[in-house]
Curated annotation (Swiss-Prot):
Biased composition (Basic residues): 557-569, 960-970
Protein name: Topoisomerase 1-associated factor 1
Superkingdom assignment: Eukaryota
InterPro entries documented for this protein: Timeless, Timeless_N
GO biological process, one term: meiotic cell cycle
Basic and acidic residues biased stretches: 320-336, 900-910, 981-995
Signal peptide per UniProt: none
Gene that encodes it: TOF1
Biased composition (Acidic residues): 926-945, 1179-1189
Spans annotated as Disordered: 316-357, 555-601, 815-841, 894-1017, 1044-1214
UniProt family annotation: Belongs to the timeless family.
Described function: Forms a fork protection complex (FPC) with CSM3 and which is required for chromosome segregation during meiosis and DNA damage repair. FPC coordinates leading and lagging strand synthesis and moves with the replication fork. FPC stabilizes replication forks in a configuration that is recognized by replication checkpoint sensors.
Length: 1214
């Protein structure tokens, strides 16, 4: 061998030298032995060395150099096949020959392994070797299946046969490895096919599907596959997916309809296909010849065309002289559309399916025999085992195995149906009398298979794995068709099984949702996905419609309703509200059980019309429109599928407006009248022609009725727009919220209107809103009630006077005629005529206003009203009053009211004021009625629930508390005492001004000028009692400070009034009291000394003694550090709802007058204050044991707040 140039050689020279030396030492043809192949002395070791080179060099280093060298050395065709030929069947007992054959297959299996481009692992070296190795694999397959010296595939089975004969429990890992090695080799041979991007120079008939099937049949590979498949789960377990792959690559893309045809019928079918292709070609040529050039238009032609806007356009070519349509089309073709550049998407078509396969007569017969035997013996064991493997996600299960499983399931189900159909046409039975043909595929028609199918569909849809979803949809379609054939078979047992299967398939609402979502969300997944999707929708709707007609009481299970009920029950349990007693205590009540069963049945009842509407939205329509665009390439069954869908939308669902879009109308017109129309000889042409004609006719009529449709034809339609365009009114819906709110209550702006004028205004509003049907309904209800009560009044007038005086005694014993007369106290129930009216009675405020004006009343209160709440005509309304109300409505309809300044009737109404509503709600729900009496006339002050300056209704924007650290200041940054005092004074003035404004706005109003002597006397009496109690408390505390601790230990409580701070000046005391109310109830409060510098406590008490019981509990504020603390006491009986804590200071903590000016320190308390030796004093409230009374320390000297070494006093109070 000539030395290769290292710079040009794609393989390292040393690697090539090693491989070539191994090939030379393997053996060769001997001239002394009649040219037969003779093994070398160390052939077995050489074969093992080759395997090591492939495993440890190519696989470990992710290279293909060794495979490239072996292909160039022609090891497979020149050496390995010749070595296998030296092992005849007569020498099967030779262990050396068996080892050598096994070593040969250990080399051929990796050499024939499918080559895939992994973007994460592909290198430049792969791109150098892949095309060469793909062509080399085609040569390997040609040499293996056409080798005359020996049956190479049969020899592979002979190698694995000793391992297969060992029971599964006694097999060693080596036996398992040999079996899998041979099966993978067979899989590789079946899988090798010419790549789409490379041209094979040899004879493709030698490597075609027909040649492969012929080799598998001739060399008994089919028998081995059937043996392993039929014993799957017993003698074989982990080989299931390998057998499935072999079968998949043998039957994929094979036309099942032709598979079960005999020789003569097959030739006839192929002839019909050829005739159809010729007709299609002629049709294409006919359309092309209309625009094709002739010998008369060799010279150039240019035409000026004047457009609608007056501009001129130049068109070249003599075909522009033909007609206006051609000229417009040429102008459109001259326009260039440059869409935005997008990254090239991955191929959406299943890459392992390839193009359709045409088998010769011999291969067709062999494959049909294998399929029939496989269905009879191996289908159920193999596919049940594979389904279990998929469910448990076995480690040897690969991603593509799921898609192959569902594809083969669909393929064999269709094959079984075709076999039954062929046998029925020939009048023969395909199976034994005691075995139903559908029992042969029962392994994929059970509940476990449906669960696996549903799970795979959901996973593929969520993961956007469109190839797998395509196979799942095809499998689902074939299952439905098979079950439908079972239902139509005429066998009672099969019909029962089919009905049970359909019931389980259609019972889950999740399946309905998945089908609808798949149909609606097609984008650009490819034609295979589009074909499978439309086939599934067509089959699902057709079978579901037929089943729902036969089972009018069909039920579905919804997970949404279950989740809603669980959520509602959980919310009820959390809120602590008692559950309805009728659902718990009355479990044995048959009436309640019947009502619950009826409600559940009504909720679960299936309505096919409502379900079919889910396939009307624009997304589903666009899916079928995209499918119909391939009408030139679709067969009759596919064209029928699209035709039935458009017919269902336009005529069965009465939503033809969804098809009224410019591109859809243009497509439908071109299918019939366009330059590339459907072939008129097609069996579907007449159906499509009639459909298109009716759709365009409806479109023209709809444009006349709804001129707005001209604009809407440019856009897709949402549900609300489509409903309005189709029916002329908006869709009436009721809010699906948990607690729907009724319509707003209205009132008249003018209060001096009489009843007739009010009814006239309400009628005018309904007429202005085109809601005259509500008026008609109200009049009918009133008229019926008037007739009923007129008859009752007539009957009452006709009774004798004696009987009328003895109603209680005699009427009960009267004849049935007299007892049938309604009593005076019987109201008339107002019943809506349809659901839309019921929703209007609940939501339409103008209809509700009219109903109240004519005398209708609600049984339920406003707060508990629901859409199902009943309205009545009370019994106290006489027939004349009802007749008068009808007359007012008729008069207003005939002569609607007219108002000044061109105002409408709706302008005379307004919503009821918020103050009125709040007062009504407060009177209904508030228990504290004493505070509402004084504020009844105020304008909204009764809603003032919090103290002035308290927390607001908005979200708190307080920043989180920062950690307090000492900050070292430079000497130049320290503030002097004068500067600190000035800042404190400004801060105090600002706070006092703010509090004065709050107090003035909240407490000072017009009622302050009025005098109430009784209220004043009561107020001063309460203040006198408080002062007396406080003085008594002071005296007791001065005598014995530990007395309260002893009483607390003995279980006693002392009720004392709240201590009020005595500050200088009324305003200062009020501000201090309001600040105290905003603090945390458990926090400590600071009050001034008992003897303030500005005098007595009476003046301060009078201002600060404003009742605080109206203030609600607010959010606890941070604790504040005080200079001094005292004890906390509970409020008196009148103030039991809230505490007003105050503190006092002992004589030991007195300070100078300068320090008293700033006694409250606003620094927050520490979370764990230091303990001090104090006396605990805790006062409790006898009236409310739930109050959180905090034990407060006795007067304790706190650590003063310090900054930069100076002790700072608070400046919040003066």
């Amino acid at each position: 061998m000539e030395a290769s140039d290292g710079s040009n050689d794609v393989v390292h020279p040393e690697v090539r030298a090693h491989i070539n030396s191994l090939v030379s030492a393997l053996g060769g043809f001997s001239a002394d032995d009649d040219g037969r192949y003779k093994l070398g002395d160390d052939a077995l070791e050489v074969l093992r060395d080759m395997k090591k080179w492939i495993r440890f060099y190519d696989e470990k280093t992710n290279r293909m150099d060794v495979a490239r060298c072996l292909s160039e050395a022609n090891v497979v065709g020149g050496d390995l096949l010749q070595i296998l030929a030296t092992w005849p069947e007569a020498q099967s007992d030779s262990k050396f020959k068996a080892r050598v054959a096994l070593a040969c297959y250990e080399i051929m299996t990796p050499l024939t392994w499918p080559i895939e481009k992994d973007p994460e692992r592909t290198t430049v070296n792969h791109y150098r070797h892949m095309p060469v190795l793909q062509l080399a694999q085609l040569g390997y397959k040609r040499d293996i299946i056409n080798f005359d010296g020996a049956q190479i595939l049969h020899t592979a089975i002979r190698v694995a046969l000793p391992s297969m004969a060992v029971p599964i429990g006694d097999r060693t890992p080596r036996d398992q490895g040999i079996i899998k090695l041979v099966l993978y080799f067979l899989r590789n041979i079946a899988m090798i096919a010419p790549p789409p991007g490379l041209k094979y120079d040899g004879d493709e008939s030698q490597i075609s599907r027909s040649a492969t099937i012929d080799a598998f049949s001739y060399q008994d590979i089919f028998l081995a596959i059937l043996t392993i498949a039929s014993n799957m789960g017993e003698d074989f377990r982990t080989e299931d997916v390998i057998i499935m792959e072999i079968i998949f690559h043998l039957v994929k893309r094979v036309d099942i309809r032709k598979l079960f045809l005999d020789g003569e019928a097959l030739s006839k079918a192929k002839g019909e296909d050829l005739v159809a292709l010729i007709k299609k070609e002629k049709s294409m040529l006919r359309a092309q010849n209309k625009r094709a050039p002739t010998r008369h238009n060799r010279f150039g032609t240019m035409v000026w065309v004047q457009r609608a806007d007056g501009r001129m356009s130049a068109i070249s070519g003599q075909d522009a002289l033909r007609d206006s349509a051609t000229r417009e089309r040429k102008m459109d073709d001259s326009k260039t559309f440059r869409p935005p550049r997008r990254s090239r998407k991955a191929e959406m078509e299943p890459k392992d399916l390839g193009s359709p396969v045409s088998l010769n007569e011999r291969a067709n017969k062999q494959l049909r025999g294998f399929v029939e035997e496989f269905l009879d013996s191996g289908f159920n064991p193999l596919f049940q085992h594979i389904r279990k493997t998929i469910d448990r996600e076995a480690p040897y299960l690969l991603h593509q195995h799921r898609a192959q499983f569902f594809y083969l399931t669909a393929w064999f189900l269709q094959a079984e149906r075709e076999r039954i159909k062929t046998a029925k046409n020939q009048g023969s039975s395909t199976t034994q009398d005691d075995v139903s043909p559908f029992n042969l595929v029962a392994g994929v028609l059970n509940q476990e298979m449906f669960i696996t199918l549903s799970r795979a569909m959901d996973r593929a849809y969520n993961d956007k794995d469109w190839p797998e979803l395509t196979t799942v949809m095809r499998c689902f379609s074939q299952i439905l068709l098979t079950v439908q054939d079972m239902a139509d078979s005429g066998d009672e047992e099969n019909e029962d099984i089919a009905e049970n299967i359909l019931n389980r398939l259609f019972y889950e609402e999740a399946t309905h949702d998945a089908i609808a979502n798949i149909a609606r969300n097609f984008k650009d997944q490819g034609f295979e996905y589009l074909d499978a999707c439309t086939e599934l929708i067509h089959t699902y709707l057709r079978i579901l419609e037929s089943y729902s007609k036969q089972n009018v009481d069909m039920q579905v299970r919804s997970r949404k309703r279950t989740r809603k009920k669980k959520k509602a029950a959980k919310a009820t349990g959390e809120d602590g509200d008692p559950v309805d007693d009728t659902r718990i205590d009355d479990g044995d009540d048959s009436a309640n059980d019947e009502a619950s069963a009826e409600r559940t049945s009504r909720e679960r009842k299936f309505d096919f019309g409502r379900f079919a509407m889910r396939f009307v939205p624009q997304g589903v329509v666009d899916t079928f429109v995209q499918f119909t665009k391939y009408y030139r390439d679709l067969d009759d069954s596919q064209l029928k599928r699209a035709h039935r869908y458009f017919f269902r939308v336009a005529f069965k669902q009465d939503m033809s407006v969804m098809l009224f879009r410019v591109d859809i109308i243009h497509l439908l017109y071109n299918m019939i009248k366009g330059p590339e129309a459907l072939d008129k000889s097609s069996s579907m042409f007449k159906d499509w022609e009639e459909l298109v004609k009716q759709i365009i006719r409806k479109c023209v009529r709809k444009i006349e009725d709804r001129p707005a449709l001209i604009i809407e034809m440019l856009f897709s339609k949402i549900n609300s727009t489509a409903h309005y365009l189709e029916f002329g009114f908006e869709k009436q819906t009721i809010s699906g919220s948990a607690n729907p709110r009724p319509g707003a209550e209205l009132e008249f702006k003018k209060q001096d209107l009489n009843l007739e004028q009010q009814i006239a205004i309400a009628v005018g509003v309904l007429l202005d809103k085109n809601q005259a049907d509500h008026l008609t309904w109200v009049k009918n209800v009133l008229s019926n009630a008037e007739v009923e009560r007129r008859a009752w009044e007539t009957a009452q007038d006709a009774l004798p006077s004696v009987e009328s005086q003895n109603v209680e005694g005699d009427i009960e014993n009267e004849a049935p005629a007299a007892s049938s007369i309604p009593q005076d106290s019987t109201p008339t129930i107002v019943r809506p005529d349809h659901d839309g009216r019921r929703g209007a009675m609940f939501k339409n405020p103008h209809l509700r206003l009219l109903m109240r004006l004519v005398g209708f009343e609600r049984l339920a209160p406003s707060e508990a009203e629901t859409p199902e709440s009943a309205w009545i005509i009370p019994a106290n309304l006489r027939a004349d009053q009802l007749q008068e109300a009808v007359g007012h409505i008729n008069a207003a309809e005939f002569n609607p009211p007219v108002f000044d300044d061109d105002k409408s009737a709706e302008d005379q109404l307004r919503r009821k004021s918020a103050g009125t509503t709040s007062r009504r709600k407060k009177a209904a729900f508030d228990d504290d009625e004493e505070n509402d009496v004084d504020n009844e006339d105020d304008d909204g002050l009764e809603e003032f629930l919090f103290e002035p300056g308290g927390p607001t209704a908005r979200k708190s924007d307080v920043r989180p508390k920062k950690k307090l650290t000492r900050r070292k200041r430079s000497p130049g940054q320290e503030l002097t005492d004068e500067q600190q005092d000035e800042k404190a004074r400004l801060r105090r003035e600002k706070d006092l001004e703010k509090q004065r404004k709050i107090k003035s706005a909240a407490r000072v109003h017009s009622s302050d000028e009025e005098s109430d002597q009784e209220a004043d006397a009561a107020f001063f009496a309460r203040e006198k009692e408080r002062m007396a109690a406080r003085n008594a408390l002071y005296s007791r505390l001065a005598r014995n400070p530990g007395e309260f601790a002893a009483e607390k230990a003995a279980g006693k409580t002392t009720k004392v009034p709240v201590l009020l701070s005595d500050e200088s000046g009324g305003e200062d005391s009020v501000a201090a009291a309001e600040r105290s109310k905003r603090r945390k109830r458990k926090s400590e409060s600071v009050a001034g000394d008992e003897d303030d510098r500005d005098g007595g406590s009476d003046g301060g008490s009078e201002d600060a003694g404003t009742p605080a019981r109206d203030a609600p509990e607010t959010k606890p504020l941070p604790k504040r550090r005080k200079k001094a603390t005292a004890f906390v006491v509970s409020s008196d009986e009148e103030d039991s709802g809230d505490e007003a804590p105050a503190n006092t200071r002992g004589q030991s903590s007195q300070r100078s007058a300068a320090e008293d000016a700033m006694e409250t320190d606003e620094t927050p308390l520490s979370s764990s204050p230091h303990k001090t030796k104090t006396t605990d004093v805790e006062m409790a409230n006898d009236d409310d044991h739930d109050e959180e009374d905090t034990p407060v320390k006795a007067p304790t000297q706190r650590r003063p707040r310090a900054k930069a070494g100076f002790v700072l006093d608070s400046s919040d109070e003066e």
